[in-house]
Amino acid sequence: MSERRKAGDFPQEILKLFDGYVHGFINRRDFLEGAARVVGGGVAALAVLEALEPEYAWAEQVPADDTRIRQEYVTYPSPDGSGTMRGYMAVPQGASEPKPGVLVIHENRGLNPYIEDVVRRFAAADFVALGPDALTPLGGYPGNDDEGRELQGRLDRDVMMEDWVAAFRFLRDHDATTGRVGAVGFCYGGGVVNQLAVRLPDLGAGAPFYGSAPSLDGVPSIRAPLMIQLAGLDERVNAGYPEYREALEANGKAFTVHVYEGANHGFHNDTTPRYDEDAARLAQERTIAFFNEHLRG
Protein backbone atom coordinates (compact mmCIF):
# COMPACT_ATOMS: atom_id res chain seq x y z
CA MET A 1 0.00 0.00 0.00
CA SER A 2 1.35 3.42 -0.93
CA GLU A 3 1.76 6.24 1.58
CA ARG A 4 -1.46 8.18 2.11
CA ARG A 5 -1.33 11.65 0.61
CA LYS A 6 -3.59 14.55 1.56
CA ALA A 7 -5.20 17.30 -0.48
CA GLY A 8 -2.80 19.80 1.03
CA ASP A 9 0.09 17.93 -0.58
CA PHE A 10 -1.08 19.13 -4.01
CA PRO A 11 -1.57 22.61 -5.49
CA GLN A 12 -5.29 23.42 -5.69
CA GLU A 13 -4.92 23.91 -9.45
CA ILE A 14 -3.89 20.25 -9.71
CA LEU A 15 -6.98 19.16 -7.79
CA LYS A 16 -9.19 21.25 -10.08
CA LEU A 17 -7.58 19.64 -13.12
CA PHE A 18 -8.10 16.20 -11.60
CA ASP A 19 -11.75 16.97 -10.94
CA GLY A 20 -12.14 17.90 -14.59
CA TYR A 21 -10.39 14.72 -15.66
CA VAL A 22 -12.41 12.29 -13.55
CA HIS A 23 -15.67 13.95 -14.63
CA GLY A 24 -14.87 13.83 -18.33
CA PHE A 25 -14.41 17.54 -18.96
CA ILE A 26 -10.79 16.99 -19.99
CA ASN A 27 -8.96 13.85 -21.10
CA ARG A 28 -5.84 12.25 -19.67
CA ARG A 29 -3.56 14.10 -22.07
CA ASP A 30 -5.12 17.45 -21.16
CA PHE A 31 -4.67 16.68 -17.47
CA LEU A 32 -1.02 15.75 -17.91
CA GLU A 33 -0.30 18.84 -20.00
CA GLY A 34 -2.00 21.10 -17.49
CA ALA A 35 -0.34 19.41 -14.54
CA ALA A 36 3.07 19.64 -16.22
CA ARG A 37 2.69 23.41 -16.37
CA VAL A 38 1.96 23.49 -12.64
CA VAL A 39 4.56 21.03 -11.34
CA GLY A 40 7.29 21.62 -13.90
CA GLY A 41 7.44 18.68 -16.27
CA GLY A 42 5.78 15.62 -17.73
CA VAL A 43 7.45 13.09 -15.45
CA ALA A 44 6.32 14.99 -12.37
CA ALA A 45 2.81 15.33 -13.83
CA LEU A 46 2.57 11.56 -14.35
CA ALA A 47 3.69 10.99 -10.77
CA VAL A 48 1.00 13.40 -9.57
CA LEU A 49 -1.69 11.53 -11.50
CA GLU A 50 -0.55 8.22 -10.04
CA ALA A 51 -0.61 9.72 -6.54
CA LEU A 52 -4.21 10.89 -7.04
CA GLU A 53 -5.51 7.49 -8.15
CA PRO A 54 -7.58 5.57 -5.55
CA GLU A 55 -6.01 3.13 -3.11
CA TYR A 56 -8.90 0.86 -2.19
CA ALA A 57 -7.20 -0.80 0.74
CA TRP A 58 -7.81 2.46 2.59
CA ALA A 59 -11.58 2.16 2.19
CA GLU A 60 -12.17 -0.75 4.52
CA GLN A 61 -13.64 0.90 7.60
CA VAL A 62 -16.10 -1.99 8.03
CA PRO A 63 -14.60 -5.28 6.78
CA ALA A 64 -16.82 -7.72 4.90
CA ASP A 65 -16.42 -10.22 7.75
CA ASP A 66 -17.43 -7.72 10.44
CA THR A 67 -19.60 -9.64 12.91
CA ARG A 68 -22.12 -6.78 13.11
CA ILE A 69 -23.34 -7.33 9.57
CA ARG A 70 -24.24 -9.89 6.93
CA GLN A 71 -23.55 -9.08 3.28
CA GLU A 72 -24.29 -10.57 -0.12
CA TYR A 73 -24.72 -9.72 -3.79
CA VAL A 74 -28.33 -9.67 -4.96
CA THR A 75 -30.21 -9.27 -8.22
CA TYR A 76 -33.53 -7.53 -8.73
CA PRO A 77 -35.81 -6.63 -11.65
CA SER A 78 -35.71 -3.29 -13.46
CA PRO A 79 -38.57 -3.71 -15.94
CA ASP A 80 -38.48 -0.11 -17.19
CA GLY A 81 -34.69 0.01 -17.26
CA SER A 82 -32.03 -2.59 -17.97
CA GLY A 83 -34.07 -5.69 -17.12
CA THR A 84 -32.10 -7.32 -14.30
CA MET A 85 -29.72 -5.43 -12.02
CA ARG A 86 -27.10 -6.50 -9.49
CA GLY A 87 -26.24 -4.85 -6.21
CA TYR A 88 -24.42 -5.28 -2.93
CA MET A 89 -26.61 -5.60 0.15
CA ALA A 90 -25.62 -5.53 3.80
CA VAL A 91 -27.95 -6.03 6.76
CA PRO A 92 -27.49 -5.90 10.53
CA GLN A 93 -26.51 -9.33 11.80
CA GLY A 94 -29.17 -11.12 13.83
CA ALA A 95 -31.87 -8.49 13.31
CA SER A 96 -35.13 -9.76 14.79
CA GLU A 97 -37.32 -7.17 13.09
CA PRO A 98 -37.27 -5.13 9.88
CA LYS A 99 -34.99 -2.09 9.67
CA PRO A 100 -35.12 1.12 7.61
CA GLY A 101 -33.38 0.95 4.26
CA VAL A 102 -30.64 3.11 2.79
CA LEU A 103 -29.99 3.17 -0.94
CA VAL A 104 -26.31 3.98 -1.56
CA ILE A 105 -25.71 5.49 -5.01
CA HIS A 106 -22.21 5.39 -6.43
CA GLU A 107 -20.16 7.98 -8.29
CA ASN A 108 -19.62 8.00 -12.06
CA ARG A 109 -17.59 4.79 -12.11
CA GLY A 110 -19.71 1.91 -10.81
CA LEU A 111 -19.89 -0.10 -7.60
CA ASN A 112 -16.28 0.09 -6.47
CA PRO A 113 -14.80 -1.06 -3.12
CA TYR A 114 -15.27 2.37 -1.54
CA ILE A 115 -19.02 2.32 -2.16
CA GLU A 116 -19.28 -1.28 -0.96
CA ASP A 117 -17.65 -0.19 2.28
CA VAL A 118 -20.13 2.69 2.58
CA VAL A 119 -22.92 0.11 2.26
CA ARG A 120 -21.39 -1.85 5.14
CA ARG A 121 -21.02 1.32 7.22
CA PHE A 122 -24.77 1.94 7.04
CA ALA A 123 -25.52 -1.70 7.88
CA ALA A 124 -23.25 -1.37 10.91
CA ALA A 125 -25.38 1.65 11.88
CA ASP A 126 -28.48 -0.61 11.92
CA PHE A 127 -29.88 0.00 8.44
CA VAL A 128 -30.49 -2.39 5.57
CA ALA A 129 -28.25 -0.93 2.88
CA LEU A 130 -28.15 -1.59 -0.85
CA GLY A 131 -25.50 -0.39 -3.28
CA PRO A 132 -26.63 -1.06 -6.86
CA ASP A 133 -24.14 -1.29 -9.72
CA ALA A 134 -25.30 0.84 -12.66
CA LEU A 135 -22.71 -0.97 -14.79
CA THR A 136 -24.57 -4.29 -14.54
CA PRO A 137 -25.71 -4.17 -18.21
CA LEU A 138 -22.04 -3.90 -19.26
CA GLY A 139 -20.75 -6.65 -16.97
CA GLY A 140 -20.46 -4.67 -13.75
CA TYR A 141 -17.67 -2.66 -12.18
CA PRO A 142 -14.53 -3.68 -14.10
CA GLY A 143 -12.05 -3.48 -11.24
CA ASN A 144 -10.64 0.00 -11.78
CA ASP A 145 -12.15 3.45 -11.87
CA ASP A 146 -10.79 4.59 -15.23
CA GLU A 147 -12.53 1.74 -17.05
CA GLY A 148 -15.58 2.19 -14.81
CA ARG A 149 -15.92 5.84 -15.85
CA GLU A 150 -15.60 4.90 -19.50
CA LEU A 151 -18.28 2.21 -19.17
CA GLN A 152 -20.70 4.43 -17.27
CA GLY A 153 -20.30 7.06 -19.97
CA ARG A 154 -21.75 4.59 -22.47
CA LEU A 155 -25.00 4.14 -20.58
CA ASP A 156 -28.20 6.04 -21.30
CA ARG A 157 -28.90 8.34 -18.35
CA ASP A 158 -32.67 7.92 -18.59
CA VAL A 159 -32.35 4.14 -18.50
CA MET A 160 -29.98 4.39 -15.54
CA MET A 161 -32.55 6.51 -13.71
CA GLU A 162 -35.14 3.77 -14.17
CA ASP A 163 -32.61 1.32 -12.72
CA TRP A 164 -32.20 3.52 -9.63
CA VAL A 165 -35.96 3.76 -9.22
CA ALA A 166 -36.16 -0.04 -9.47
CA ALA A 167 -33.48 -0.36 -6.78
CA PHE A 168 -35.44 1.92 -4.47
CA ARG A 169 -38.60 -0.14 -4.96
CA PHE A 170 -36.73 -3.41 -4.44
CA LEU A 171 -35.35 -2.14 -1.13
CA ARG A 172 -38.66 -0.58 -0.07
CA ASP A 173 -40.51 -3.86 -0.64
CA HIS A 174 -37.82 -6.16 0.78
CA ASP A 175 -38.83 -8.29 3.76
CA ALA A 176 -35.81 -7.04 5.71
CA THR A 177 -36.93 -3.40 5.60
CA THR A 178 -39.74 -1.45 7.20
CA GLY A 179 -40.61 0.11 3.85
CA ARG A 180 -39.02 3.40 4.91
CA VAL A 181 -36.05 4.05 2.62
CA GLY A 182 -33.63 6.93 2.35
CA ALA A 183 -31.03 7.57 -0.34
CA VAL A 184 -27.46 8.78 -0.08
CA GLY A 185 -25.25 9.41 -3.08
CA PHE A 186 -21.88 10.82 -3.96
CA CYS A 187 -20.93 13.00 -6.95
CA TYR A 188 -23.05 11.55 -9.81
CA GLY A 189 -24.93 9.66 -7.10
CA GLY A 190 -25.67 12.88 -5.24
CA GLY A 191 -27.32 14.20 -8.36
CA VAL A 192 -29.35 11.00 -8.59
CA VAL A 193 -30.56 11.52 -5.01
CA ASN A 194 -31.81 14.98 -5.96
CA GLN A 195 -33.60 13.52 -8.98
CA LEU A 196 -35.12 10.69 -6.94
CA ALA A 197 -36.46 13.27 -4.49
CA VAL A 198 -38.29 14.87 -7.41
CA ARG A 199 -39.44 11.54 -8.83
CA LEU A 200 -40.43 9.51 -5.76
CA PRO A 201 -43.10 10.80 -3.36
CA ASP A 202 -42.36 7.92 -0.97
CA LEU A 203 -38.63 8.56 -0.63
CA GLY A 204 -38.14 8.82 3.14
CA ALA A 205 -35.12 11.14 3.14
CA GLY A 206 -32.32 12.18 0.81
CA ALA A 207 -28.68 12.98 1.54
CA PRO A 208 -26.90 14.14 -1.63
CA PHE A 209 -23.14 14.65 -1.35
CA TYR A 210 -21.74 17.19 -3.82
CA GLY A 211 -24.17 16.19 -6.56
CA SER A 212 -25.76 18.24 -9.31
CA ALA A 213 -28.96 20.09 -8.50
CA PRO A 214 -32.09 18.85 -10.29
CA SER A 215 -34.16 20.79 -12.78
CA LEU A 216 -35.83 23.54 -10.78
CA ASP A 217 -39.24 22.90 -12.29
CA GLY A 218 -39.29 19.60 -10.41
CA VAL A 219 -38.74 21.12 -6.97
CA PRO A 220 -42.48 21.48 -6.17
CA SER A 221 -42.76 17.68 -6.40
CA ILE A 222 -40.19 17.04 -3.66
CA ARG A 223 -41.65 15.56 -0.48
CA ALA A 224 -38.62 14.00 1.19
CA PRO A 225 -36.53 16.03 3.63
CA LEU A 226 -33.05 16.68 2.26
CA MET A 227 -29.66 17.03 3.88
CA ILE A 228 -27.35 18.54 1.27
CA GLN A 229 -23.60 18.11 1.82
CA LEU A 230 -21.24 20.35 -0.17
CA ALA A 231 -17.48 20.83 -0.33
CA GLY A 232 -16.39 24.41 0.16
CA LEU A 233 -13.79 24.26 -2.64
CA ASP A 234 -16.13 22.56 -5.14
CA GLU A 235 -16.79 25.54 -7.41
CA ARG A 236 -18.21 23.42 -10.23
CA VAL A 237 -21.02 21.77 -8.26
CA ASN A 238 -21.66 24.63 -5.86
CA ALA A 239 -22.43 27.01 -8.71
CA GLY A 240 -25.81 25.34 -9.19
CA TYR A 241 -26.93 25.49 -5.58
CA PRO A 242 -27.99 29.11 -4.90
CA GLU A 243 -30.93 28.79 -7.30
CA TYR A 244 -31.76 25.29 -6.01
CA ARG A 245 -31.74 26.53 -2.44
CA GLU A 246 -33.97 29.48 -3.35
CA ALA A 247 -36.41 27.12 -5.08
CA LEU A 248 -36.50 24.80 -2.06
CA GLU A 249 -37.18 27.75 0.24
CA ALA A 250 -39.81 29.25 -2.06
CA ASN A 251 -41.67 25.93 -2.16
CA GLY A 252 -41.51 25.36 1.60
CA LYS A 253 -39.40 22.21 1.41
CA ALA A 254 -37.65 20.69 4.43
CA PHE A 255 -33.91 20.84 3.87
CA THR A 256 -30.58 21.67 5.44
CA VAL A 257 -27.29 22.51 3.72
CA HIS A 258 -23.88 21.78 5.19
CA VAL A 259 -20.82 23.27 3.50
CA TYR A 260 -17.47 21.84 4.58
CA GLU A 261 -15.07 24.73 4.16
CA GLY A 262 -11.63 23.84 2.89
CA ALA A 263 -12.83 20.46 1.61
CA ASN A 264 -12.67 19.34 -2.01
CA HIS A 265 -15.22 17.55 -4.17
CA GLY A 266 -15.03 13.88 -3.19
CA PHE A 267 -14.04 14.57 0.42
CA HIS A 268 -16.01 11.56 1.70
CA ASN A 269 -14.09 9.10 -0.49
CA ASP A 270 -11.30 7.84 1.73
CA THR A 271 -9.36 6.18 -1.10
CA THR A 272 -7.93 9.34 -2.68
CA PRO A 273 -5.99 12.38 -1.44
CA ARG A 274 -9.11 14.52 -1.77
CA TYR A 275 -10.41 12.74 1.34
CA ASP A 276 -10.91 15.06 4.30
CA GLU A 277 -11.11 12.92 7.42
CA ASP A 278 -12.73 15.51 9.68
CA ALA A 279 -15.30 16.59 7.10
CA ALA A 280 -16.08 13.00 6.12
CA ARG A 281 -16.56 11.86 9.70
CA LEU A 282 -18.84 14.79 10.54
CA ALA A 283 -20.84 14.38 7.33
CA GLN A 284 -21.29 10.66 7.96
CA GLU A 285 -22.41 11.27 11.55
CA ARG A 286 -24.88 13.90 10.38
CA THR A 287 -26.23 11.60 7.69
CA ILE A 288 -26.81 8.72 10.09
CA ALA A 289 -28.53 11.05 12.58
CA PHE A 290 -30.66 12.46 9.74
CA PHE A 291 -31.75 9.01 8.61
CA ASN A 292 -32.43 7.95 12.19
CA GLU A 293 -34.68 10.98 12.60
CA HIS A 294 -36.67 10.54 9.40
CA LEU A 295 -36.70 6.78 8.76
CA ARG A 296 -37.37 5.32 12.21
CA GLY A 297 -40.49 5.40 14.31
Which role fits each region the language model picked out?
Residues 1-30:
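N-terminal secretory signal peptides
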Residues 19, 28-53:
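N-terminal export signals
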Residues 58-95:
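N-terminal cap/lid segment of alpha/beta-hydrolase-fold proteins
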Residues 98-107:
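Short beta-strand element of the alpha/beta-hydrolase
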Residues 109, 135-158, 266-271:
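Cap/lid segment of the alpha/beta-hydrolase catalytic domain
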Residues 150-174:
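Alpha/beta-hydrolase active-site loop
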Residues 166-223:
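Primarily recognizes the serine-hydrolase "nucleophile elbow" in alpha/beta-hydrolase
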Residues 228-230:
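Short beta-strand/loop motif that positions the catalytic acidic residue
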